[in-house]
């Protein structure tokens, strides 16, 4: 009689032979695979805020991911200090596990940011859609080169950590795209994908959640009235909080450096009277530094902001869930969250929604949709050999998924060149790759 093997956190979907002379933990192995992955390298040419420029100062998705990992560990260390000896402490991730989760959280970010995401979601509307976080989950578990069919073949807990939305596209999709096949007829809000994983990756989700009791799995997958998942794991909450801190503070730094945001704009949005005395003093400290002409003072101000947000993290509980890794989570405290939202509103209104950035995003959206259309029209002629082999082996909707995987993996620069080779007269040669 075969013994039943209980699932574990360090288990991988495809079993691997152990090396006796390998001193690394399973999570260190995950971290190593992510560090050396092509998906991580591609993030170096995907900009964090579209259109900020080509200077080596401005952040890319790669530098952002590195900063998320560092902030994530900072939050973890603060929590370990604060909860030393408590029941929660033994369920906290180790540093390498959290770094692995944070480093890979943007794997699925498509070319041209949200414009690219909207274009691919519309192009895939009849074939399972597209969503950046769903693509991250797919890259880690199926696409990235390491194993035959399991991507990087990461541990169960690493996959759970990047799983922001534990529901499928078909369960959460609310838009039926009744306006027809012309993408230009749809406002951006109608092109946005639901927060999900793909239906074709449900097998991985089921495997990840196999470690929990059926009651927890049912509750964990529940959606709110907007069809958005209600829950995420402890590790994912740490990653998401670090991500929120990183992109808010560091996008602000880039925008100040570019002179897109000035002190007058800041004062118009950040009303210190709206906050407690301790937070008002903190804001005043930032005011004296982040707009200084001295680079060292600016950097100190940005560091002060990160420190403030890290030390504002609080613990929460979902009483409906029983397993501690689903039950417990961490987020910014109410006042810190309100302040972060105010800072993000400056960036959104004064930079991201400006004509300059919106034109670039719209252009990127059109380019990605056009590239996808050409590849679908004649995959035999236009897909690279390796991708074409996958396409020919796939059936049904999965053929379109192969094309979507290929386009979403392009960098901004490669997508631009691909578009030009298709549509710009006299551009390109047989030597282009």
Curated annotation (Swiss-Prot):
Q: Which NCBIfam families does the annotation name? A: antiphage_dGTPase, dGTP_triPase, PRK05318.1
Record keywords: Hydrolase
**Organism of derivation:** Deinococcus radiodurans (strain ATCC 13939 / DSM 20539 / JCM 16871 / CCUG 27074 / LMG 4051 / NBRC 15346 / NCIMB 9279 / VKM B-1422 / R1)
Listed InterPro entries: dGTPase, dGTPase-like, dNTPase_2, HD/PDEase_dom, HD_domain, PHydrolase_assoc_dom
Which CDD domains does the protein's record reference? HDc (cd00077)
According to UniProt, the name of this protein is Deoxyguanosinetriphosphate triphosphohydrolase-like protein 2
- PANTHER family attached to this UniProt entry: DEOXYGUANOSINETRIPHOSPHATE TRIPHOSPHOHYDROLASE (PTHR11373:SF32), DEOXYNUCLEOSIDE TRIPHOSPHATE TRIPHOSPHOHYDROLASE (PTHR11373)
The UniProt record lists the keyword Hydrolase? yes
Q: In its UniProt record, which GO terms are filed under biological process?
A: dGTP catabolic process
Asked if the record carries the keyword Cytoplasm, the reply is no
Chain ranges of the HD domain: 61-248
Please report which protein family the annotation says this sequence is part of: Belongs to the dGTPase family. Type 2 subfamily.
Q: Which GO terms describe its molecular function?
A: dGTPase activity
Q: Which HAMAP family match?
A: dGTPase_type2
């Amino acid at each position: 009689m075969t013994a039943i093997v209980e699932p574990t956190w360090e288990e991988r979907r495809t079993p691997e032979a152990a090396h006796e002379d390998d001193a690394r933990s399973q999570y260190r192995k995950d971290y190593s695979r992510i560090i050396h992955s092509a998906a991580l390298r591609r993030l170096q040419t995907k900009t964090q805020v579209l259109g900020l420029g080509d200077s080596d100062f401005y952040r890319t998705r790669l530098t952002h991911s590195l900063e998320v990992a560092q902030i994530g560990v900072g939050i973890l260390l603060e929590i370990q200090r604060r909860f030393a000896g408590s029941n929660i402490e033994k369920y906290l991730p180790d540093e390498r596990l959290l770094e692995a989760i944070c480093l890979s959280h943007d794997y699925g970010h498509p070319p041209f940011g949200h414009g690219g995401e909207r274009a691919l979601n519309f192009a895939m509307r009849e074939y399972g859609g597209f969503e950046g976080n769903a693509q991250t989950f797919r890259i880690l578990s199926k696409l990235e080169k390491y194993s035959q069919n399991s991507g990087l073949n990461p541990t169960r807990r690493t996959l759970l950590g990047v799983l922001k939305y534990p529901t499928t596209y078909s369960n959460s999709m609310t838009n039926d795209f009744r306006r027809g096949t012309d993408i230009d007829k749809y406002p951006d809000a109608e092109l946005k994908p639901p927060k999900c994983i793909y239906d074709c990756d449900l097998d991985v989700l089921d495997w990840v959640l196999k470690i929990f009791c059926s009651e927890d799995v049912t509750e964990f997958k529940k959606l709110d009235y907007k069809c958005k998942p209600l829950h995420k794991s402890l590790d994912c909450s740490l990653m998401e909080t670090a991500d929120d801190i990183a992109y808010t503070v560091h996008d602000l730094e880039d925008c100040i450096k570019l002179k897109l945001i000035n002190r007058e704009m800041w004062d118009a949005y950040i009303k210190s009277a709206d906050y407690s005395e301790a937070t008002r003093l903190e804001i005043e400290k930032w005011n004296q530094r982040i707009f200084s002409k001295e680079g060292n003072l600016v950097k100190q101000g940005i560091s002060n902001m990160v420190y403030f947000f890290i030390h504002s993290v609080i613990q929460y509980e979902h009483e409906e869930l029983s397993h501690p890794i689903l039950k417990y989570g961490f987020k910014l405290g109410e006042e810190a969250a309100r302040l972060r939202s105010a800072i993000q509103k400056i960036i959104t209104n004064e930079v991201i929604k400006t004509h300059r950035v919106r034109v670039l995003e719209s252009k990127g959206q059109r380019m990605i949709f056009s590239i996808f259309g050409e590849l679908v029209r004649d995959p035999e002629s236009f897909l690279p050999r390796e991708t074409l082999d996958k396409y020919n082996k796939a059936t049904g909707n999965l053929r379109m998924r192969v094309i979507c995987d290929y386009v979403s993996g392009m960098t901004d620069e490669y997508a631009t060149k691909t578009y030009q080779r298709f549509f710009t007269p006299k551009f390109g040669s047989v030597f282009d790759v």
